[in-house]
Swiss-Prot record:
LRR repeats lie at residues 502-523, 526-547, 551-572, 575-597, 598-620, 621-643. ATP binds at G171, M172, G173, G174, V175, G176, K177, T178. One of its GO terms (molecular function) is ADP binding. Residues 24-88 form a coiled coil. Keywords: ATP-binding, Coiled coil, Leucine-rich repeat, Nucleotide-binding, Plant defense, Repeat. This is Disease resistance protein At4g27190. Belongs to the disease resistance NB-LRR family. Residues 167-429 form the NB-ARC domain. One of its GO terms (biological process) is defense response. The keyword Transcription regulation does not apply.
Amino acid sequence: MECCAPVIGEILRLMYESTFSRVANAIKFKSNVKALNESLERLTELKGNMSEDHETLLTKDKPLRLKLMRWQREAEEVISKARLKLEERVSCGMSLRPRMSRKLVKILDEVKMLEKDGIEFVDMLSVESTPERVEHVPGVSVVHQTMASNMLAKIRDGLTSEKAQKIGVWGMGGVGKTTLVRTLNNKLREEGATQPFGLVIFVIVSKEFDPREVQKQIAERLDIDTQMEESEEKLARRIYVGLMKERKFLLILDDVWKPIDLDLLGIPRTEENKGSKVILTSRFLEVCRSMKTDLDVRVDCLLEEDAWELFCKNAGDVVRSDHVRKIAKAVSQECGGLPLAIITVGTAMRGKKNVKLWNHVLSKLSKSVPWIKSIEEKIFQPLKLSYDFLEDKAKFCFLLCALFPEDYSIEVTEVVRYWMAEGFMEELGSQEDSMNEGITTVESLKDYCLLEDGDRRDTVKMHDVVRDFAIWIMSSSQDDSHSLVMSGTGLQDIRQDKLAPSLRRVSLMNNKLESLPDLVEEFCVKTSVLLLQGNFLLKEVPIGFLQAFPTLRILNLSGTRIKSFPSCSLLRLFSLHSLFLRDCFKLVKLPSLETLAKLELLDLCGTHILEFPRGLEELKRFRHLDLSRTLHLESIPARVVSRLSSLETLDMTSSHYRWSVQGETQKGQATVEEIGCLQRLQVLSIRLHSSPFLLNKRNTWIKRLKKFQLVVGSRYILRTRHDKRRLTISHLNVSQVSIGWLLAYTTSLALNHCQGIEAMMKKLVSDNKGFKNLKSLTIENVIINTNSWVEMVSTNTSKQSSDILDLLPNLEELHLRRVDLETFSELQTHLGLKLETLKIIEITMCRKLRTLLDKRNFLTIPNLEEIEISYCDSLQNLHEALLYHQPFVPNLRVLKLRNLPNLVSICNWGEVWECLEQVEVIHCNQLNCLPISSTCGRIKKIKGELSWWERLEWDDPSALTTVQPFFNPVREVPLLIADATTQML
């Protein structure tokens, strides 16, 4: 019996605890429900905030992103489960409450755990690097690749070692040197103030080393303005001074092909600036040794497992399936661990499920090994696989991109025009249709990793190795792709033995050619492309040289010093499709072009021609004429333009020639009515002499145009984002002008130095017709008759507010420059603008402007994203109404305020503009409050003087801590006063 006592006691204890727990849960049912509701509310809010902040993690490491995504997924599941249980408890009887209470407690524990993890994520999100010390360099990371991580660690060790002042990173092309140093750069950026360098400068050098270009990149990071006429020596001295001011700097020179004398660039020696370092990447160890590196790190190919993971990432999940995995792994191994090859082949095979296709690919890669004679060719074979997957048309398009110099950012429109001239684009109808097809091909080549984004908008370029591969294809081939590519090599002369009858394309662009051989016979009888642009020293093209290329379709002599073009009747270029003479500033005259029967494009932009090219009217296929920036063009004979029956594009932007209507033009000169006869015209940019054109509503041919730029009056160009169909009126009296018929087709209107603008505006308002297509309005240098203005305002506002016409219902941009308004409300009320679609306001040198919106106007501008105001001396605030319940710009992202000495406030005290991302305040010394709080999670950059920043007052003390990392101080300079000649008269 005694032995049973402990057992019975334990049983009774467990029964008591179980019973007590049930009773306690039943008693605490309501409190558990309340606790769960409160925790659930906090977790839901935390999850919402986390979603908004998710973008800020895009530049951080992958594991953190994955953890965040997993946390969000788990939080969503728990929130759904909790809400379901809370709904069930409503119908839960008293007898079931203990069980329900236990379930609620269990879910409550899960909610609290997720809440704790979420708070940790918020803490991580609040820690940001200092952006001005290290600029982010876009691209993939190698953090989780074993070999690359080891090499990165070696470089980091070198950065902390006193013995390693210069570090060389070397390896074969495409192995990942750039990716490695890019990762290093971005890791330093993430570390913010904890990393040891005051400034990190990332510079792309490239094969054809240009000291001036390298200096420009360094100077840009140092905020040093470069001037074209400044010598390299003088700029080097300024760079030296700038770098010596830095506490420590790290200079990363990427893609160095030849030894560089850093002294000539202005780089201080390491003994002069203790702790500073230089890293260079090169394909050749000899370059590193010549530059006296202290530590050389060889970049090897990826380990097999890392290579396989990279291959899977690019080829997709199909390679992990049982029927493909084994073969796919063999294909990955054939890439030899070379990242560029792995990415290219993986992308080419992405989503391919057919096993026979994979076997075919493996066979191709395996069989190519025996005839490879060099390491570089081993790189090309995997690239050739991707190339072979292209259609024939895409192959030719790809190879043509290799005609440009290394690291050259190619204008997409230029290369597509070449493709069109070569006949690669299908005849889809208009040039615009063909251009769209070409852009689609560009995107396809980018998807295959054979092209990548260029350094500027709407440009592309080739990776060095990919370009080398393309040249290898063209130089070794004897078929339609056989080409001679010597672009950007510093070539000073071209020998005849370099040319061959089998050549299809010849690129000698961007060299130092001073002369060309005068050949005596048709030699390059298959050549369709001859690129000679960028040879600034070339003054003459011998007729014999061009006669050697009888089948040319593309001839580019842009940027040369030629004064004349050989007689076309002697050249016999009967197949020529496109002739580019852009920026041949010495060219003043052309021969008759009537024998160029197949010519479709002529580019004379920036030439000094005096008269319209002769013979174009005889060309039945001619479609594109560029006469922009022809500053000396004086004559266009009558009845010539009207005969260009196939013309689709006439670009005379910033040309000296001014078109007139019939009856106003000089005798024998073309009139604007001739342009109306061009039934196929789609793109037009011209300058008109005066306003009669605007009075003639019969010019409805304009509505046929897809794009137009019409400048009426003096030459005046101001770019906006909506210039597809733009009308500019400059230096004219427009009191009698009626432009309503034209505004119906216009997307952008600019009025500059115009008199009688009140009468014109009054007519537009009285016509009671809105202009739905107009998205941009610019008013500049306008003095408004205040009495007339007030009269029009009162006339318009006398209507019921609901009846007021919105003259510009889709306006997105508004630019006011040197306009004597006191409030923006005057313009808004007079024109009946509701501003519901307005995104950008830019105001400068409006000396009388006191406020944007006055006390009578409680308008909000719901979609406004950017405000930029400068040199408005009288501006005191943005909104005169002292109390309004919500921000009048609830979606503002960018706020730029410059040189506003009397600006006192931009918002109510304590008001918050949650969407703000970028703030710039310079020389606004009386402004002491910003609409920013600690909840403004989108702030990316705040720019201003340090003294102003330190004077700011904060309604929310924690706001300063939150946004301090995003503040970029600017150099404090005296307030610039605009020249009197630029002020209102």
